[in-house]
């Protein structure tokens, strides 16, 4: 395995995942509330692994031949994010919530899994960034497996660090204003 290609995949993976979007905010919230953190991080990382593998090993070509796939994902994702964003904005405006020691109940495991899958698979940028952009960059390297493994490892490191590292931020989120900012 070519280590420079592995680290290239890792650095590209980190650069694409670091922006705090709806999915990362959801992982952060679950980590702050310490509810279903492992399963949320695992779903996000495994989903990324599937998308990275598809992008690196040819799914990007399939999408470029059938752009309707992206259009459907884009519009379904936009609708989901608009509805969820509106709900979060309303909750931020109406709420004075702060983090309590045991965390606020966010629903049962099935609800959390459904939300996590929606944030992951209905996000239009995931296809553009993870599949097409990563796939395009990977097409320029000879050791695609090393590149893919590096990018996949970056996802696992990032999601589990975000989910479990969130507890460090709990004192900050004891203030209702912090939750309002995160919700918005």
For each of these PLM feature ranges, what is it?
Residues 5, 65-97, 152-162, 170, ...:
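Selective transmembrane alpha-helices of multi-pass membrane proteins
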Residues 3-71, 131-146:
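Juxtamembrane transmembrane-helix termini in multi-pass membrane transport proteins
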Residues 5-9, 39, 73-74, 81, ...:
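Small-residue packing motifs within transmembrane alpha-helices
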Residues 141-157:
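Short alpha-helical packing/oligomerization segments
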Residues 94-113:
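Flexible interhelical linker loops that connect adjacent transmembrane helices
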Residues 47-59, 81-85, 127, 158-166:
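Alpha-helical transmembrane segments and their lipid-water interface positions
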Residues 109-130:
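Selected transmembrane alpha-helices and immediately adjacent juxtamembrane segments
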């Amino acid at each position: 395995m070519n280590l420079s290609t592995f680290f290239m995949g890792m650095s590209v993976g980190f650069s694409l995942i670091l922006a705090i979007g709806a999915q990362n905010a959801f992982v952060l919230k679950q980590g702050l509330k310490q509810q279903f953190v492992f399963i949320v991080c695992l779903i996000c990382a495994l989903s990324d692994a599937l998308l990275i593998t598809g992008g690196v090993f040819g799914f990007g070509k399939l999408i470029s031949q059938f752009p309707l796939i992206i259009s459907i994902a884009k519009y379904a994702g936009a609708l989901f994010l608009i509805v969820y964003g509106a709900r979060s904005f309303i909750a931020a405006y109406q709420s004075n919530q702060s983090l309590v020691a045991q965390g606020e109940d966010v629903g049962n495991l099935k609800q959390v899994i459904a939300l996590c899958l929606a944030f992951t698979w209905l996000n239009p940028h995931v296809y553009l960034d993870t599949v097409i952009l990563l796939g395009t960059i990977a097409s320029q390297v000879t050791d695609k497996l090393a590149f893919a493994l590096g990018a996949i490892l970056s996802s696992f490191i990032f999601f589990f660090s975000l989910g479990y590292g969130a507890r460090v931020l709990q004192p900050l989120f004891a203030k209702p204003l912090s939750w309002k900012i995160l919700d918005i």
